[in-house]
Regions:
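Hydrophobic alpha-helical and helix-loop surface patches within well-folded domains
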Residues: 1-221
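Long, His/Glu/Asp-enriched segments that create or flank divalent metal/ion-associated functional microenvironments
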Residues: 199-252
Length: 252
């Protein structure tokens, strides 16, 4: 890790010596806790790229999320393991998330996975609110969906199999599916390839619960046909684990 006094980027995950702007890496006894937290997150993010991006690299830029979404999630995992008293996951729930939710609720926003047809388009896809912030929270949702042990095992197998190679998202899905026994590709497809996010409405009447999903949207242009597989947590066995239809009716 090398701190540079004059560096245009905040940090860069070079394959070997990672470089940082001094303010993104250096702290002292007088530094505020918020500065130390930010430095820890940046260092963890760039270190995560040694696996997500360097050891295994996406085949083409439409899978940029393989690098950035995972590295953004891993920065919080790493910081929490070193400094559990920081309660960094509380920050994960709000830091950048509000920006992402606002950005993702308007027309014209890109999806996490977006086709790139020409090198001139590459610079336009580095959307911090979507590929980084939203993508990281989707990866954390996936971690909860497959389970911690299956997630770790699947990643270990993925890195071992594809070390020093290029991959696509489906390669990772197959590794996580093999480790968890779940169809990860089907679960993640609409989350990655559709812009926006859903809101769930619950209506209860005479012992019946109706759950309906629709896209949360601000303004005109709402797509009423979009559906996401939404994880549900409930103490009633009649309520399914996943809502993957526009609406369902449940007897309680």
């Amino acid at each position: 890790h090398i701190a540079l006094p004059d560096f245009s980027s905040g940090a860069m995950e070079n394959w070997g010596p990672m470089t940082y702007r001094e303010t993104a890496m250096l702290a002292n006894a007088k530094s505020s806790l918020s500065s130390k937290r930010q430095i820890a997150l940046v260092i963890a993010h760039e270190t995560a790229h040694q696996w997500f991006g360097n050891l295994v690299t996406m085949r083409w830029w439409d899978d940029l999320w393989l690098n950035e979404s995972f590295a953004t999630m891993m920065e919080y995992l790493a910081a929490d393991s070193f400094y559990p008293d920081w309660n960094i996951w509380e920050e994960f729930a709000v830091n950048e998330a509000i920006l992402s939710l606002r950005r993702d609720a308007i027309d014209g926003v890109q999806s996490v996975h977006i086709p790139v047809h020409h090198p001139d388009e590459i610079g336009t896809i580095f959307d911090g609110a979507i590929v980084y912030a939203k993508g990281a929270r989707l990866m954390n949702m996936l971690r909860n969906y497959v389970g911690e042990e299956a997630f770790k095992s699947g990643l270990a197998n993925y890195f071992e199999k594809f070390a020093y190679q290029n991959t696509v998202g489906d390669d990772l899905w197959r590794a996580l599916s093999a480790a968890s026994g779940k169809d990860v590709a089907s679960f993640m497809e609409s989350w990655l390839k559709q812009p926006g996010y859903p809101v769930v409405e619950a209506d209860y009447d005479n012992g019946k619960l109706k759950l309906s999903q629709s896209q949360f949207f601000i303004g005109e242009g709402k797509n009423k046909k979009r559906v996401w597989p939404i994880l549900l947590n409930a103490n009633n066995p009649n309520i399914p684990k996943i809502l993957d239809e526009k609406s369902i009716m449940v007897e309680l």
